[in-house]
A protein has these predicted regions:
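Glycine/tyrosine- and acidic-biased, solvent-exposed loop/turn segments at the edges of beta-strands
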Residues: 1-232
């Protein structure tokens, strides 16, 4: 095949217009719906997607749009809810997620945002409630949670404080009530509860004291047992 080729629906309307060069897609590429609205529009170069591409959903609203190079997503892309509102902005570097990614609720309020490096989450990421109030914040390193992560009540007070190492819970854990009283304290070791854990009511009264010990089971997997419990 060479040059422009046009395909038709049984009703005679155009289904697709494409261009070939020596049997390879090359040039403008257009796909239509049966009602003659656009489904997909883009461009090929030597058989691979190249340049700007746009897709529309069944509601005739934008579904996604962005650029390609040698068949790979490259640069900024935008994705939309089926009702037409912007869902998220994304960035790619030759097919790999790279740079800022920002997600939105339908009303445009920021949902979550952060960065990718070499297709992995990197640095500070935040997540919000639909009201716009901060829900969660923490740092990624090579795609894994690292350091202190904070989870918030919708009134802005801290709900949980946790420590991670290479994506696994390691270190202190503290849970708080909406009015800042401590509800739970303890430590994790390699993702499992370890040592003394205390549970309180919202009036700071100790309700439960537990001690955890990690042992190796017969199949060499870590198991956790409660070796002491004192319930008030």
């Amino acid at each position: 095949k060479d040059g422009k080729w046009t395909f038709y629906f049984p009703n005679g309307r155009i289904e697709k217009c494409v261009n070939y060069k020596k049997d390879t897609l090359n040039g403008a590429y257009l796909v239509m719906n049966a009602d003659s609205t656009i489904n997909t529009i883009g461009n090929y170069q030597s058989g691979k997607k190249h340049g700007d591409w746009t897709w529309y959903n069944e509601n005739k609203s934008l579904e996604m749009e962005g650029g390609c190079t040698e068949g790979l997503q490259h640069g900024e892309w935008k994705y939309y809810f089926s009702s037409g509102e912007l869902s998220y902005n994304a960035n790619f570097n030759r097919g790999a997620r790279s740079g800022q990614w920002t997600y939105f609720f339908k009303d445009g309020t920021l949902f979550k945002e952060g960065k990718y490096l070499n297709d992995q989450k990197e640095g500070l990421w935040i997540t919000n409630y639909e009201s716009g109030v901060l829900l969660m914040t923490g740092v990624y390193s090579k795609g894994k949670e690292q350091g202190i992560w904070l989870n918030y009540w919708e009134n802005g007070n801290i709900k949980n404080k946790a420590e991670f190492k290479n994506g696994v819970l390691n270190g202190a854990w503290v849970s708080y009530s909406p009015n800042k009283n401590i509800l739970l304290t303890g430590k994790y070791k390699n993702g499992l509860k370890s040592g003394e854990w205390k549970t309180f009511n919202d009036k700071n009264k100790l309700l439960l004291l537990e001690n955890f010990k990690v042992i190796k089971s017969e199949d060499s997997k870590n198991e956790i047992i409660v070796i002491g419990r004192n319930q008030e």
